[in-house]
Amino acid sequence: MASLSSRLLSGFFAAFCAASSLITPVAAFAADSTVLDAGRSAEEKARDADRKPLEMLEFAQVKPGQTVVDYLPGKGYFTRIFSNAVGPTGTVYSDTPQLVIDKFKDKGLPPPVSAEPGRSNVHEVVAKGDNLGASKADLVWTSQNYHDVHIWAGAKGTADLNKSVFDALKPGGIFVVLDHAGAAGLDDAGMSNLHRIDEALVIKEVTAAGFILDGESKVLRNPADNHELKVFDPAIRGKTDQFILRFRKPG
């Protein structure tokens, strides 16, 4: 199967769910805090209080030995944590579309996490790189950028992405979408301007690909955020209201 990146790129060039109130129970997959220690900078660790990575690992039910895809990983904050969590018997794919690489190369791309010491379980995946085999992943994770897929690829490209994620997961596999919450009914222009997205739209689109909404975490919700500011506005940056949705592939 083509990589998730490749499937998303094909979407570029080829052209309210009631269950949203579900709250995940206390996780049975308790994360070990030592996964936050190895191979992470002081700068990254300083962000842990706001990003709550242990709660994220528990919600995503990450375990040693799993295969995890970190889709659009940015500087690799979660890639490193996943690498530590799945351990030497697991695999992490850091999946960045070629279009994104081309878009940001003039600004300087972060060095690949796979090149860091102790990261032999991390593999970089781009549109022309090695591919993730069909039905192999336990988890596909995307953080604060599902809205970007909409901005760059539109509804068709987003649907292609969701289908490729579904195909890449094992039966029973998990797709987690974490993003900045937008107002109900936020349109494409508002999405592009504010870098937010309506949670209900995400649920509608992902379940349309065959997924079941399996849980929601509220640990990053912020009722003080009125959803009207750009996420980069100093008044709200790092403190936006964020939804975290767990979808499961049947099986």
Located regions from the model:
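Conserved class I S-adenosyl-L-methionine
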Residues: 65-74
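Class I SAM-dependent methyltransferase SAM/SAH-binding core
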Residues: 75-131
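Class I SAM-dependent methyltransferase Rossmann-like catalytic core
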Residues: 32-59
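A short glycine-rich, Lys/Arg-flanked "PGG" loop and its adjoining helix->strand segment in the class I
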Residues: 83-84, 156-171
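A short acidic, Gly/Pro-enriched loop at the edge of an enzyme's catalytic core
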Residues: 130-140
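Conserved beta-strand signature within the Rossmann-like core of class I S-adenosyl-L-methionine
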Residues: 172-180
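A short SAM/SAH-binding and catalytic strip from SAM-dependent methyltransferases
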Residues: 138-159
